[in-house]
A protein has these predicted regions:
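Small/polar-rich, solvent-exposed N-terminal microdomains that initiate assembly or binding
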Residues: 1-55, 107
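Charge-dense, low-complexity intrinsically disordered segments
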Residues: 3-7, 82, 86, 120
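Short, charged/polar surface micro-motifs in flexible loops or helix N-caps
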Residues: 50-52, 70-73
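Catalytic micro-motifs at enzyme active sites that drive phosphoryl/nucleotidyl and oxygen chemistry
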Residues: 51-54, 111-121
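Oligomerization/assembly interface segments of phage tail-like spikes and tubes
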Residues: 57-72, 124-136
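Short acidic, glycine/proline-rich loop/turn micro-motifs
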Residues: 75-79
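Short, hydrophobic/π-rich interface segment
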Residues: 82-106
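A helicase ATPase "motif cassette" and its flanking acidic/Ser/Thr-rich regulatory loops
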Residues: 139
Length: 140
């Protein structure tokens, strides 16, 4: 299912995450990741990356994703970091698999990086970037 606009991809990703992944409590297309902190559970925040390219039949653009959860709890800090990293990696893997199986995403592997406690609210998890193809509209 090749898309024709960036806006279409962004909106579809939000719908997919909200309807098919109940473990994701908050989804937002935003630059700042500390929105929706009143929600408990895993959050998916994504934004447009700086890279795009024009090709012969399709164009390419990238979205940066962060799958995050709170690290600051009453649990042992090391155990919580391990739990959050494991959970967010598992959810991200399923999410990327769904996008690939349904034609949104086309590459065979995705590099995933660990997000340490980098936000003031103690959010951590995993981050990854996906490239998407856009069909060119045919102008005659």
């Amino acid at each position: 299912m090749i898309q024709t606009s960036i806006k279409q991809v962004v909106e579809n990703i939000k719908v997919i995450a909200q309807t098919l992944f109940p473990e994701i409590a908050f989804v937002d297309f935003a630059k700042y990741h500390d929105k929706g902190l009143e929600k408990e559970g895993v959050r998916l925040v994504y934004s447009l990356s700086d890279s795009m390219s024009f090709n012969m039949h399709t164009d390419l653009f990238s979205l940066n994703f962060e799958m995050l959860d709170l690290l600051e709890t009453l649990q042992d800090p090391d155990e919580r970091i391990l739990e959050v990293t494991s959970d967010t990696r598992d959810i991200s893997s399923s999410f990327v698999d769904y996008l690939k199986k349904n034609g949104y995403y086309f590459q065979d592997s995705v590099s995933v990086t660990k997000v340490d406690k980098k936000y003031k609210d103690g959010l951590g998890g995993v981050a990854f970037t996906l490239d998407f193809n856009l069909a060119k509209t045919c102008l005659v």
